[in-house]
Each structure stands twice: as C-alpha cells, then as structure tokens.
Amino acid sequence: MASRLTPLTLLLLLLLAGDRVTSDMIVGPGNLQEGESEGDSQKGGILDGESIQGNEDSPTLPITNLTVVPATVTKPFSQPATEPVQSTIQPTAEPFCLAPVTSCSDSEIRSAEAVLGEALTDFSLRLYQDFSVLKKRETNFIFSPFSIASLLTQILLGAGGETRVSLEHLLSYPQNFSCVHHALRAFMSEGFTSFSQIFHSSDLTIKDTFAEASQRLYGSSPRPLGNDSTASLELINDWVAKKTNLRIRRLLDSLPEDTRLILLNAVALSAKWKIAFDKGRTSTKPFHLKSSAIKVPMMNSKKYPVASFTDRTLNRPGGRLQLSHNLSFVILVPQTVKHHLQDLEQALSTAVFKAVIKKLEMTKFHPTHLTMPRIKVQSSQDMLDYFDFIYDVNLCGLTEDPDVQVSGIRHQATLELTESGVDATAASVVSVARNLLLFEVQQPFLFLLWDQQHKFPVFMGRVYDPKG
C-alpha cells in the first residue's frame, strides 16, 4: 500500500427520466419490482421515519418505470353557464415556483452559513442512522453528507410546490432558505473540492434562469447529450474519472433509454495529516471483531497530538486528530473490546453527537500514545428509497416539461488513510508529557471528517474491517 493519504472522492449521481404525468400518479402492480408490494413503492426513509432496504450492490442504476393512470378531474364549483362569476379562490401567499436568488449580502451569507452548518450536522446524523440500520451488520460504509446535500440543494434552484417544501424539510433547512447556495459556496476550502455538472437530453429544454443560476452559484452550466448513447456514456464517465482523480473510473455501464436529465456531484479530499506518522513504526497488530480478531497494519506513535476524552453519556472514548486546511479526523470507539459499535450507534442522538463534537473542539491536544489502523473504505449505495420527495417531483424552475421524474440516485465513496502528512518532521518537536495519554483504535469505530471553521461533517462512516 502506498504510504500516503489519497484523496477521498465521492460521487452522487441523480438520474431523471421522462414518463407522462397527466394527473395524480398511480403505480400499477405490473410495474413494481419483483418482491415489492404496492404499498412499498411510496415509502421514503428519512422524512417519514420508515426505511426500505435498497440493493446497495447493484452495478447499474435502477430505473423505476411508472405506469400513470389519469385520474378523473372534477371542477371544485359548478356554476350555470349563463352566470359567470369571479373566482373565490385566493392566490397563495408566495409564487408556486420561486425564481432562484442569485444575490445575497455579506451579512445574509454569514447568517446562512451558521444555519447551514447546523442543518448539515442534523442531516448527517440522520443519514448515518439510516445507513447503520439498512446496511448489513458489521460492514464498512462511508458517505459525504456535504456531497449529497450539495446536489439536493442545487435541485432546490428549480424545485417548486411540495417538492421544494419536502427538500427543505429533508435537509433541515428553514423555509425559503434562499441564501443557502451562497453559503455552500463559502464552505469550499483548500482541504476539499466540490464539482457539479448537469447533463440533459437534447429534447429537454432547460430554463435560462436555472442555467444562469447554476453557472453563477455552482460553476457549471447544463450540457446537452447527443443522440449517440455510447458517446454520451463515455462523456459522463470521463467527467466522473477526471473529477475524482481516476478513483472512480467508470460509474455507469449503460444509459437507460428514458434518461433525460443527469445531475452529478463529486467531492475530492486533498487534506492530509497535519503531522505524519512514522512508517517505520507501523506494525501488524490485532483488530478485534465481535467474536474474532484479524491482523492489520497499525500506525503507531508514542507522542502524537490527540484531543481526547471519554463521554459520560456514551461511556465511550472520542478522539480528534488534526488534518491540514482546518479539518479534523474524529474517531468514536467503544470503550473496550467487550463493547460493540452497534451500542454506540444506538446511543448517539443528535444532542449527544453535538455535545461530543463541542467537547472535542474545546479539548486541547496532548502528546498521546496512539495506535490506529491504516484505513481503506469503499462504499456504494442506491439512494432512491431514502427520500420520499422523488415520487412526484415538481421541477418547474428547471424546465417547462412536466414529464420529468426521478428514476435513480447513486452515491459512491472511497477513503484510504495511511501514514503520509503535510509536515513529516513536525512530530519531532512534540514534547513527551510525564503522564502520557493512551488512545487505541483496535476495534470497529465510527469516524467523521469535521470542518472546524464552519462546524459540519464533510464525510462520515464506520469501519469494521480496515482492509476494506
């Protein structure tokens, strides 16, 4: 394994397909997936508290074809033809489809940044809790709440009606959080980079207001795809490979025929350990699972600066290690090998999570005898069943076409942590305390990469097997 901290790359892919929608959407039994009941088709994980197990290992994006049965339309009032009357229906307090806000003052952006940090933290923990339940037990996973939220927030530029309300609720945003796009842009740092791109079929007209707002706020304008599906597939996969530094070389093997709109977001981590580990001290040691132990390469340091404490509520130790560019690597690990990560996950409420992070940020770094494994984590999940706004989406601000519906969402992530750091000699200037602290990571643990400036998790996950 190369001795370096390789860029962590993530990709969130959103496909939208066109199916004729004339009125209320009704899913016919003939269009359900094998083993799925009619009631299952309308479930969503985060909004209503119910979750559906997705096929997390599927190599291609699932496409849900909907058979739409027109509903009978009746007028709310019956009036004689000879006596026309004025409508008694009052206009709504706000427009059905809000125009994108592309200008915010500095004070508005600063205020939005504080709100966004809190919202991303709430969103992150709810996603983690859903993943920890739906993923197979004792398996690794990693995701970027920042990447997922960035793409869903970009959709907000063109969302209207209930779709907009549902998205804001899902992301823990206040209603009409118009300066969120500027706040997201302000969250960019040298430690990680976010890329967005929209591809669409040539027959789908994108509104100029959306294209202009997307370019100004996210740095990309929608790009049309040609009629050659092979060339379109190559164009998309090339974009993915380039933006993820070849960590994800081929996301899609084929493009569904009815795909009309593809939204992509990739996040690449360039931060490294602020203080490198000595590769000469890395040795093979046991990593304890529930009923066995495996041998893995363990990085060791007798005087590594760690901010750590044992939380009374969780009764579990937590530690924070410094990365470059104002980022931290936070670890929550069971207290002993007799305790299990699942118990920690169940006890980690939003209030407890925020309290732990706050305590770790307030705790000073001390020279610590640190033992932790090299890490290699890869994860892929189909996000379609996590969100319930997607079943009848309103993208009136993005296109005039009412037929566009979401058919697939996929998220991919990889992480590899080794000894390499920004300053390979900095460890030599750390003095050894008389009472040396001990922080050992030799069993399954929860981790997150924390942005110290804006107070939110960029990445989050768990490790059961450090070898991946």
Swiss-Prot record:
N- and O-glycosylated. Residues 1-23 form the signal peptide. Disulfide bonds join 97-396, 104-179. Residues 27-60 are annotated as: Disordered. Its main location: secreted. Keywords: Blood coagulation, Disulfide bond, Fibrinolysis, Glycoprotein, Hemostasis, Protease inhibitor, Secreted, Serine protease inhibitor, Signal. Glycans are attached at residues 65, 176, 227, 326. One of its GO terms (cellular component) is extracellular space. The record marks 434-435 as: Reactive bond. GO terms for molecular function: serine-type endopeptidase inhibitor activity. It comes from the Eukaryota. SMART domains: SERPIN (SM00093). It holds the Pfam family Serpin. It is found in: Secreted. InterPro entries: Serpin_CS, Serpin_dom, Serpin_fam, Serpin_sf, Serpin_sf_1, Serpin_sf_2. Belongs to the serpin family. May play a potentially crucial role in regulating important physiological pathways including complement activation, blood coagulation, fibrinolysis and the generation of kinins. This is Factor XIIa inhibitor. It comes from Bos taurus (Bovine).
